[in-house]
Regions:
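Residue-level signature of outer-membrane beta-barrel architecture
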Residues: 100, 105, 139-143, 200, ...
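Surface-exposed coil loops of outer-membrane beta-barrel proteins
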Residues: 162-296
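Detector for outer-membrane/organellar transmembrane beta-barrel domains
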Residues: 263-265, 269, 286, 294-385, ...
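Outer-membrane beta-barrel "beta-signal"
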Residues: 397, 431-448
Length: 448
């Protein structure tokens, strides 16, 4: 992530913040499954088509049982679809709440709201309140033999955290009001996605889709960390975020994709790689100044692979290369294991290549979600340290316990800790062996 400026906002929770939080709660608690018998029959027929390997796209494929829902981009389970147009595994758990249909659109909501206390540790680590939130609304309906999709995503981070974001040791630096800020994660924008899509079968084996809008995610990297079933319960952003899924909020996206046999997907995007932070409460200027391409492959229900390349033509021209593998497995007694591994490389002219590795997993067992994440990242954008490219290792682990469930919502309490290793040249700045720890409350739709 490059140094940037964010607009002036008040750091205390304004009346607008309370209204947004209230709307978040009311929206998730008001939705009830509203589907006719005809819709259920359409879904059953769609499932039979999928078993035969056809590309038929039913007009109204959703029904009350989330496991039988189809995606917005093709005739596959909705669980496959991550952020933007990315793929995950089919067998991953769904955390979704059905809403009443409106105007022929089947509506659903996903998301997470996390709020708590964090002490980042060491000489450089801040401590205090921390919030991490993302709310997604999706609508889809049959149109002209294909599927029209509407995609909206918002975050309360700017309201709760302010422009300085939250403590996140070894996160890349950014600038607020002309002041460099390091070891903190900048907030997501209020408008994180405002986009539409249309998918249509082209033949027995091929289907195609279009996706785009004023705010969206290009075909670069994989599913954003709050959308991955392996990472959505982890309350801290990866310090490798800018090597893999850092372009997930772009003010201008247009993507064209081709799918073969519901297993292979090739797509290309034009998008805006300018940093979106200067418009925390609005939408920036629509531009298509960068490009990317991605190849995805789902050989089975449990596996998903992808590789992508992007040219980011912003303040600093950058090339990005990514590889990823995701795995999910439904276990006995309703347990699920979800894991993701990825490699990302950023190349800036005149600078050495920088690499990032990540491996994370979450084990869903009864009311628990045990999580762990390991990262190894080459860092050259740390603030107020001697110039250089430093390899930083981070291991984070914790658990969330669901203590209450009502109206398809789970309320959980979590705790976590983070450990680090890095070159001794940073000891004077970061101290020896800093430890991060935090506690948090999490609200999200229940697992289905």
């Amino acid at each position: 992530m490059y140094l940037r400026k964010t607009q002036r906002v008040r750091r205390w929770i304004s009346p607008c913040g309370f209204a947004a939080c209230l709307s978040f709660t009311l929206l998730l608690t008001s939705g009830l499954p509203v589907h006719s018998q005809q819709s259920a029959e359409s879904t059953k027929a769609a499932g039979m088509d999928g078993m035969r390997g056809t590309q038929a796209m039913p007009a109204m494929p959703m029904k009350g049982v989330l496991g039988e829902m189809k995606g917005a981009f093709g005739n596959w389970p909705a669980s496959r679809e991550g952020s933007g147009t990315s793929w995950q595994t089919d067998s991953g758990p769904m955390f979704m709440k059905m809403l009443p249909s409106v105007g022929g659109f089947d509506l659903s909501a996903m998301g997470t709201l996390q709020a708590g206390y964090v002490n980042a540790g060491g000489k450089r680590g801040d401590k205090g309140f921390s919030s991490n939130s993302m709310l997604m609304l999706m609508g889809r309906k049959g149109l002209g033999g294909g599927i029209l999709g509407l995609h909206f995503m918002t975050s309360l981070d700017p309201i709760f955290n302010g422009p300085r974001g939250v403590p996140n040791l070894f996160q890349n630096g950014f600038t607020v009001h002309g002041v460099d800020v390091g070891d903190r994660k900048d907030p997501h924008n209020i408008f994180a996605e405002v986009a539409a899509s249309y998918s249509h079968p082209l033949s027995k084996n091929f289907s195609g889709f279009l996706y785009g809008g004023p705010v969206g995610e290009p075909a670069l990297g994989g599913a954003m960390y709050l959308h991955r079933t392996s990472g959505l319960n982890i309350p801290e952003a990866p310090i490798s975020h800018d090597w893999f899924d850092g372009s997930h909020i772009s003010f201008g996206v247009a993507t064209l994709g081709l799918v073969y046999q519901n297993k292979w997907k090739l797509e290309g995007s034009l998008f805006n790689s300018d940093e979106p932070g200067v418009k925390l409460y609005g939408v920036g200027r629509f531009r298509l100044n960068s490009s990317s391409g991605r190849l995805s492959y789902n050989p089975s229900h449990d596996w998903s692979f992808s590789t992508s390349y992007g040219y980011l033509n912003s303040d600093v021209n950058q090339h990005r290369l990514t590889f990823s593998a995701a795995y999910s497995r439904a276990l006995t007694q309703g347990d699920t294991l979800s894991a993701t591994a990825y490699f990302g490389q950023n190349i800036v002219q005149g600078s050495p290549k920088s690499n990032a590795w990540l491996a994370e997993a979450t084990y869903y067992h009864a009311k628990e979600a045990f999580f762990a994440r390991y990262e190894r990242v080459d860092k050259s954008e740390l603030i107020d340290v001697p110039p250089g490219n430093y390899t930083v290792n981070k291991f984070l682990f914790g658990d969330v316990h669901n203590f209450y469930s009502k109206d398809q919502l789970d309320y959980g309490l979590g705790a976590y800790a983070g450990l680090y290793s890095y070159p001794s040249a940073l000891n004077d700045v970061y101290g020896n062996n800093p430890i991060t720890f935090g506690v948090f409350l999490r609200i999200q739709p229940g697992k289905s």
